[in-house]
């Protein structure tokens, strides 16, 4: 079992004095197992889509970058697609964050938030699973992975006292727009061969509104 948020970062399961466990496992390792089981048991499988909403979408975006099952299953011909929806925070690949979120074209530079680059918001102090994947592989995989970012037009929430999240933008809506722009800043426009962002008209922080949209 995991705490309220450890699971969406791929952290190890818990082993406490109150609830002892014989071993610990990363939540991302469980996803690896599920991927392999699906492909091994369904020979005609053509596509796997992993989606999640809010806290779940934080797992989707990080597993899309650092998950290892896909790397060992490329020869199967299965198409892997990730669809995070209304995401509260993202994984950045360097120390730069948006300088002014109130402008139409975003620019990026250093931030005063000392925790901004700590995992799960950045690439410093990666947990065990992500560390085993490695920063170079994480960065390369994210660029080459099919990811569709969905965000509600009216998802204005997500404020927190955590500066590492707030320097990504004031709300979930603006964070998604900023991050999508950041991808082009970091990788160049070729990243958009695999990455898309769609703002869902009329939707707020509501999964049903997102998935029932056209």
Place the predicted regions along the sequence by residue.
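Alpha/beta-hydrolase active-site loop
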Residues: 2-42
